[in-house]
């Protein structure tokens, strides 16, 4: 059959949860006292929202084909991302065949190179790319994972990220990743509290459950080394994103310093094959965690994953709900997936991008069979107020 072309590209913003999962009301574990690069300043230590972690908000990209089919995706980018989509990127999509995703990605990336490369521009390109995959899969009446080569496993298994790994174990997850609460600015007392928290959690979950620490770019090499060496007693499986994303040299040193058997992970805030090439060739980590909504989308994640596979490094994408699930189920070097516990107390399983998406699947007993609904299999919640700030 003749493939349709792209007729319209539209960009919307929405507040309150969704893809910007830090945009939560008060009392949520994700905005508690968590170590961050800004924790060196006491006034920004207690809450991540205090320094503006949620200022961007969610970006919704909607792409309509000439046959009326509509694909969409969500990511973090807000009004800045909407401006980039409407004022710059739309010209590379409208009028193109829905199949020409590689060409469209290439033109979006290289046309923004002078002000992009990473950050909100790559978030935005990622959102457009995911919407293109959703659109193409809907045109072909297939789930996205079939376009990626088909599943290599019957179901996904998950670890949980949240404040209560002990409850995650009861829910059937294979492991739990804790947010590190205290960084270098809080001295020896903070380091002691980090280790006490880990010891307490190990006593609750037993020895047969993974425990990991998410350090969210907040440490330096000496502190991260001390933390890793002391945490080894409690069976820490990996230590995550300890350093700023551009400190490839520090990551390489840290990987040499950690105890034998403990993994170093990073990549949540890295982007494109070129950024991950640095991590891989400099032997910075044992597993990479690209976020498909930030690293360049599915089109770029395919390349990143192949590069990692050639280096015998696992790919465990960061969060991103269905956009990750459809990829992970198709890759041998992605043996498990992450699930962000978005219940305020991390005490129940709720959809990761709630309330924005409908039909968003969640793990049951830590497992999930990825739905075979066309596209990514989700719908926008009509009760969420979408605003199009830059209509054309």
Swiss-Prot record:
Enzyme class: lyase
Residues annotated as site: Increases basicity of active site His: 291
CDD domains: MR_like_2
Cofactor binding comment, as recorded: Binds 1 Mg(2+) ion per subunit.
Entry keyword set: Lyase, Magnesium, Metal-binding
Catalyzed reactions: L-rhamnonate = 2-dehydro-3-deoxy-L-rhamnonate + H2O
SMART domains: MR_MLE
Protein residues bound to Mg(2+): 214, 240, 268
Enzyme Commission number: 4.2.1.90
Active site: 318
Protein's name according to its UniProt entry: L-rhamnonate dehydratase
């Amino acid at each position: 059959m003749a493939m349709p072309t792209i007729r319209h590209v539209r960009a919307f913003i929405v507040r309150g949860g969704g893809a910007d999962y830090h945009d939560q009301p008060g009392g949520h574990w994700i905005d508690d006292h968590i170590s961050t690069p800004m924790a060196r300043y006491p006034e920004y230590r207690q809450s991540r929202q205090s320094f503006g972690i949620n200022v961007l908000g969610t970006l919704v990209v909607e792409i309509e084909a000439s046959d009326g089919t509509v694909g969409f995706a969500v990511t973090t980018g807000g009004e800045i991302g909407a401006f980039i989509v409407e004022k710059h990127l739309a010209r590379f999509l409208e009028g193109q065949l829905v199949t020409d995703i590689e060409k469209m990605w290439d033109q979006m990336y290289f046309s923004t190179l002078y002000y992009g490369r990473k950050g909100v521009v790559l978030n935005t390109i990622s959102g457009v790319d995911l919407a293109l995959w959703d659109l193409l899969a809907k045109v072909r009446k297939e789930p996205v994972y079939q376009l990626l080569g088909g599943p290599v496993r019957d179901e996904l298994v998950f670890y949980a990220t949240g404040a209560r790994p002990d409850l995650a174990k009861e829910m059937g997850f294979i492991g739990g990743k804790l947010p590190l609460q205290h960084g270098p600015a809080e001295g020896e007392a903070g380091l002691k509290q980090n280790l006490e928290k880990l010891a307490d959690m190990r006593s609750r979950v037993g020895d047969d459950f993974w425990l990991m620490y998410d350090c969210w770019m907040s440490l330096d090499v000496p502190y991260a080394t001390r933390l890793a060496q002391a945490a080894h007693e409690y069976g820490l499986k990996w230590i995550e994103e300890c350093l700023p994303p551009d400190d490839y040299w520090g990551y390489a040193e840290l990987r040499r310093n950690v105890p034998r058997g403990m993994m170093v992970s990073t990549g949540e805030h890295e982007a494109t094959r070129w950024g991950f090439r640095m991590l891989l060739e400099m032997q910075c980590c044992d597993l990479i965690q690209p976020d498909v909504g930030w690293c360049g989308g599915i089109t770029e994640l395919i390349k990143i994953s192949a590069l990692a596979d050639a280096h015998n490094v696992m790919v465990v994408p960061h969060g991103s709900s269905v956009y990750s699930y459809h990829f992970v189920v198709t890759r041998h070097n992605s043996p498990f997936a992450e699930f962000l516990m978005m219940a305020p107390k991390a005490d129940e399983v709720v959809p990761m991008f709630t309330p924005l998406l409908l039909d968003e699947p969640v793990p049951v007993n830590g497992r999930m069979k990825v739905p075979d609904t066309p596209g990514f299999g989700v719908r926008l919640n009509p009760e969420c107020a979408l605003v199009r700030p830059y209509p054309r």
